[in-house]
A protein has these predicted regions:
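Membrane-interface helix/loop caps of multi-pass membrane proteins
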Residues: 1-157
Length: 157
């Protein structure tokens, strides 16, 4: 089920992307980080996603009079897994070349947890918090937000 294009949401996406990019750019003036609120961009993405998913569900309920959990989750998988697999396959050769063997073991585990949409738990319980200084050695650390989003949709589609 295709939702109508909403150009105003692109403006919100732009704000979200820029806040995350500026945060990760670590731009400083006289030693002071000028943008400390990158997390706001992630929050904006969560809100946009919740809004769009709710719109899709309501539209399906209005048109068909019912809602299929199976179809909902099939659409989520078809939308997310191909891009996630592409990123993983693209990253593998670089990780093989640049990561130390001990780091590569954690990298391999992070792939499995990312595919299971539970990387937020993996990174948290393995002491690899998002925002940690060694984040550059964790190519899939960013998948914590995807995991949180998908866990939310398991509980509250």
């Amino acid at each position: 089920m295709r939702i109508n294009y909403r150009p105003e949401i692109d403006g919100l996406r732009a704000i979200a992307v820029l806040s995350v990019v500026f945060y990760h750019a670590h731009i400083t003036i006289f030693g002071n980080k000028i943008f400390k609120g990158g997390f706001i961009g992630v929050d904006i993405f969560f809100v946009i996603s919740g809004y769009l998913i709710t719109s899709i569900i309501l539209k399906e309920l209005i048109i068909t009079g019912s809602f299929s959990f199976k179809k909902f989750y099939e659409r989520r998988v078809r939308r997310i897994i191909p891009a996630l697999l592409f990123v993983m396959l693209f990253t593998l050769p670089f990780a093989w070349i640049y990561l130390l063997p001990s780091t590569y073991v954690d990298f391999s585990k992070s792939i499995l947890y990312s595919l299971g949409f539970s990387s937020n738990f993996f990174f948290h319980y393995s002491g690899q918090e998002y925002g940690a200084e060694n984040g550059l050695l964790k190519p899939f650390l960013h998948t914590w937000s995807l995991s949180v989003e998908e866990q939310y949709y398991v509980l509250f589609p």
